[in-house]
Amino acid sequence: SDISFEVNKGELFGLIGPDGAGKTSIFRILTTLLLPNSGTATVNGFDIVKDYKQIRKCVGYMPGRFSLYQDLTVEENLNFFATVFNTTIEQNYNLIKDIYVQIEPFKTRRAGQLSGGMKQKLALCCALIHKPVVLFLDEPTTGVDAVSRKEFWEMLKRLKEQGITILV
């Protein structure tokens, strides 16, 4: 019920706790997808209730269950998320390039036909497509093989080096 923490810019911060402790709820509150029952919180200096529109523009969120459109192709998913944030793949390609080159050979494949590791990479690209300053990753390596898990943490390290604040 009482929780308080501060994450510095460019930090990789892990929120750890048992199942049912409220980690996902905290992420949903901080990404303005869920209203808190009480208390206050800010993300990137913005109040989560009053400034929710500004927060949505500056955060990326990758839920525990990938929020991909299974019937859309890799490229269609990326274009959809880019359009939602009024941007394009090309505008922010430098941010997703390291990840995108790994899924590009599958760009015409439907998301539902991708392996767990490829879905994870696509979901991360979609969360990054609008160049967020804060990235929320809810259990990002669940159900992913050891090699993909290691690659994923390497990608996060590179994102951190680019100044993105990451909460896992």
PLM regions with names:
Residues 3-168:
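ABC transporter nucleotide-binding domains
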